[in-house]
Regions:
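N-terminal beta-strand motif that seeds the catalytic metal site of vicinal oxygen chelate
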Residues: 1-17, 72-77, 126-137
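Residues that flank catalytic or metal-binding motifs in active/ligand-binding sites
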Residues: 2, 41, 48-50, 71-73, ...
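Core segments of cupin and vicinal oxygen chelate
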Residues: 8-51
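Short, conserved charged micro-motifs
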Residues: 15-17, 82-87
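Short amphipathic alpha-helices in soluble, non-transmembrane regions
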Residues: 19-23, 88-93
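Vicinal oxygen chelate
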Residues: 30-33, 41-45, 90-137
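A cross-kingdom feature marking solvent-exposed beta-strand/loop segments within repeated
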Residues: 61-62
Length: 137
């Protein structure tokens, strides 16, 4: 398991992209991600050796008790065995936000699960089936 990216909710995607680029970051993908019948614009930015996904509304946000505040909102873990990682997280006290879903977009194809830790950390487990994102340095 490793951290693949962080997710952040922002009020203005284009303004945030320009800000990150002004800091030396790079727009890797400006992607539309289909999830539960809706398309979400979720640009992927690279800053040094890390990725950052940004969105004006997170794909799982409708399933939460209240809307997310702006700022960092979840961490994405890349894993090899999604079933085992999800079961381990649930057994350790995590709650499921959205069931395992297959998502295909500009980044490739992934199986994803959205969960919340007992302490409230929102996280995503991702099994990459096809990767179309450039490797980090």
């Amino acid at each position: 398991m490793r951290i693949w990216t962080l997710g952040a909710k922002v009020p203005d995607l284009d303004r945030e992209i320009a800000f990150v680029q002004a800091l030396g970051g790079e727009l890797v993908l400006d992607d539309l991600i289909p999830f539960e019948g809706e398309d979400f614009r979720v640009p992927l930015l690279r800053l040094g050796d890390k990725y950052l996904h940004i969105a004006e509304r997170m794909v799982y946000e409708e399933r939460l008790r209240r809307p997310l505040d702006f700022g960092l909102c979840h961490v994405v873990f890349e894993i090899d065995d999604l079933t085992a990682a999800r079961e381990a997280a649930l057994a350790a006290g995590a709650s499921e936000i959205a069931p395992v879903t297959r998502v295909s977009a500009g980044f490739g194809t992934r199986d994803v699960a959205f969960l919340r830790s007992p302490g409230g950390i929102l996280f995503e487990l991702v099994r990459i089936l096809e990767n179309a994102v450039p490797a980090l340095p």
